[in-house]
Each structure stands twice: as C-alpha cells, then as structure tokens.
C-alpha cells in the first residue's frame, strides 16, 4: 500500500503479559526451558486472589512440580521477588516451607536471608508453626533457633513458640 508522504505508518506488536494464572500452569508443566523463557517477560510481583505469588504457589504445589527448587527460587530472586512477601493470610514462603515440611526449600530460603520472625494474621511465626507440627523430627525447630528465631514472640492469643512447646510437651 502506498501512503501519502504526510502519513506515518506504525506497526506495533503487542505482547500479552502472562498472568499469574498462566504462570501457574507453566510451572506445572514439565518443560523447564519453556518455563524459564516465559519467566523473562513475567511481572514476578504479581499475585493471585489469595495474595500468593509464584514462590508461594511453587511451595504449596511442590510435589506436582518437576523444576528444581534451587534453580527456580534463584530465578525468582534474580527477577526481584521478595522472599519475605506475605500472602493475604500473612504466611511467607518460609512459613509455608515449614507448614509443608519441605526441608530443601526451607534451607534455600534460610540461605537467602528469609526473615525468621515474620508473623501471619494470627501472630504465628515459622517457629510457632514448627513447634505445632513437631512429630519427632526437630529439624525445623533446631534450624530456626540456630539461625536466631525468637522463641518468645507471642501470637494474637498470647502463645509463644516456647509456651506452646511446654503446653504440648514438645
């Protein structure tokens, strides 16, 4: 098509940004290369209706995801994800790793300087959750205490990890 000289033709390709729902599906696929490629154009700070970011989703669906934790979490952090970001219920990635009993993810988050004492909406810390879930393996409790978690932080009901441990005889 010949246009008059006073008309400028602009050809713009608009690339649709992936939503967090799109990325959740990508994360569940078994194609790591495609996921990493898709991650390039993704706004890592996006959240779903529960306030979950992609790291929260990864942790809660860990058993269904084939992508290696170290690589994925490292990429999320490189893209600018705040590992201390909270869901609407106040749970952080570290809290979720304790709740889901995922030692490998827990260690990665500890080594990435996750905040040990952030409280959820009920005032519970990751250490409180570790004490509550204790079933004979003290890994999470030991690691949190060794790394400086405060056992005396009380939740909204006045219960600290230390007092909880005494109450349930842990």
Positions of predicted regions on the chain:
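Conserved ankyrin/ankyrin-like repeat signature
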Residues: 34, 68, 72, 104-105, ...
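Ankyrin repeat domain, specifically the short helix-to-loop turn at the C-terminus of the second helix
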Residues: 37-43, 74-82, 107-115, 142-150
